[in-house]
Every structure is written in C-alpha cells, then in structure tokens.
Amino acid sequence: MGIRKYKPTTPGRRGSSVADFVEITRSEPEKSLVRPLSKTGGRNSSGRITTRHIGGGHKRAYRLIDFRRHDKDGVPAKVAHIEYDPNRTARIALLHYVDGEKRYIIAPAKLKQGDRIENGPEADIKPGNNLPLRNIPVGTVIHAIEIRPGGGAKIARSAGASVQLVAREGRFAQLRMPSGEIRNVDVRCRATIGEVGNAEQSNINWGKAGRMRWKGKRPTVRGVAMNPIDHPHGGGEGKTSGGRHPVSPWGQPEGRTRRPGKESDKLIVRRRRTGKKR
C-alpha cells in the first residue's frame, strides 16, 4: 500500500491524502459473504446515547470474516482476491478452499492474489497460515490471536497490528502485545502468521471534517467549551481551564481505563507502560 497526496487545489484538499489501493484486486464483495448492516447512531434499544461521536456516514454492507479457522484444518485454499472492507482498517482476502467453500480472512502484509493458504498444526510458517500457538516458533510475528481456545481471533486485527511470541512455558505462551504488555495465552489458542497489512493507514491525513463524517464519525467537543449542565469542565466567564483535574462528562477521572482486580489480570506477566503512577 502507498499513500497518494493531493495538491492544495482547495482548503479541504490541502495536506490531505488517500490510500492508493494498488493491492485491491476486486471492487465488489462476494455476495454470499455479505450481510446488511444498520446504523445505530451510537444509541441503544432505548434510544439513549451509549457511544458518543457516532452517527451518519456512508451506507455499508458487513463482510463475514472467518475468525475461527479450525474447521478447515488440512484443507488448503487459494487467495482469490484482496478486497477493501469499509468496516475495518485492514484489507480482507477472499479464500477459495479446495472443497469449494469461500471465506474472508484479515489480509496480512505481503499476502497477494494466487498465494496458497493452510490451516492446522502441520501448516508452514508463512504469512496467512493459521496454527495453534504450540506449533509456532518462538520469535515469530503473529496476528488475529484467540484469547480462549476456539473463541475466535480477538487480538491484533487492525491495520499494521502485530504481536510477537516471545516465550513458551508449560501450557502458556507469552505474547508481547502492541501496547508493550507481555501476557500469557493458552498454547491451544490459534494465531495467524505475519502482521496485518495496510500498515500505512495511520499516516493518512483526512484533510477535512467532511471525510470523517463520511466515515460516520461526529465531532468531539471539549468539555471546557460546554455549558456547566453538559460537562463538569463547562461554564465560567471567558476561556477557562476547567478548574479541576480532567474528568469525563460523568465525573470519572481521566486515565485508568483498566478494571483493577479483573480475573484475567493474573495472566499479565509485564504490564504496559502508561506513564502514570500506580
């Protein structure tokens, strides 16, 4: 993937850039793997906002991604196409299995049309192949990792994401997460070799607010710019700094996004660096 920069023909184009999509081989998705997707506007079934800054955006169709590949062990597949997916930052790859079934997977870096993909403990260590952690050599870069055996890939699924298998001891493998955290994961959990493709996604300059609205993202308003009824930092005469330590709209102090005493904390070998005192 590369990034194409625009010339400053308008204020909105100045400094903006877009992916060149050279890796995309087909523009229309596989119909059998597409489902309708309705917009929520960030509201729950009661109509209340549960996630802020969501609303509008272009209509999308959801592509069914195969995050559990264990049922295709020993069945090779060929990469038929690399496609764009509006629902995620990564590209997706359409696989044609030799038994006739078609499935989408997250497209790793360096995967291209015509490549052969394998699943299972006997698969080769090459990008796109899916194996249990017990069969992957220490030091390998992986993505799309399960947290529980058979639970489907949960970790490292966005563009450019990767995890490194740093050690294996007993029934646990130690993984270095994108955050720097080192965590124990059951060796029966499966992972895909390589890092997720489209790594330059983070370097795109969106250029104008309108492009973010096309993506379904609404403005993020600072608390100090609100009225006191709307935010603890709101109000005051003229511009103010908020007058207190940073808090959320509901008064919760900023930072500290992890729940203390969580059951899975015992699996953390080394915590991520946060820059905050514990």
Swiss-Prot record:
Keywords noted in UniProt: Ribonucleoprotein, Ribosomal protein, RNA-binding, rRNA-binding
Pfam families: Ribosomal_L2, Ribosomal_L2_C
Entry's Gene Ontology cellular component terms: large ribosomal subunit
Bias kind Basic and acidic residues: ranges: 255-268
InterPro entries noted in UniProt: NA-bd_OB-fold, Rib_uL2_dom2, Ribosomal_uL2, Ribosomal_uL2_bac/org-type, Ribosomal_uL2_C, Ribosomal_uL2_CS, Ribosomal_uL2_dom3, Ribosomal_uL2_RNA-bd_dom
Stretches with biased composition (Basic residues): 269-278
Gene Ontology BP annotations: cytoplasmic translation
Chain positions covered by the region annotation Disordered: 29-53, 223-278
Annotated signal sequence range: none
GO terms for MF: rRNA binding; structural constituent of ribosome; transferase activity
HAMAP family in the cross-refs: Ribosomal_uL2_B
NCBIfam families: rplB_bact
Similarity comment: Belongs to the universal ribosomal protein uL2 family.
Described function: One of the primary rRNA binding proteins. Required for association of the 30S and 50S subunits to form the 70S ribosome, for tRNA binding and peptide bond formation. It has been suggested to have peptidyltransferase activity; this is somewhat controversial. Makes several contacts with the 16S rRNA in the 70S ribosome.
Quaternary context: Part of the 50S ribosomal subunit. Forms a bridge to the 30S subunit in the 70S ribosome.
Protein name per UniProt: Large ribosomal subunit protein uL2
Annotated source species: Kineococcus radiotolerans (strain ATCC BAA-149 / DSM 14245 / SRS30216)
Gene expressing this chain: rplB
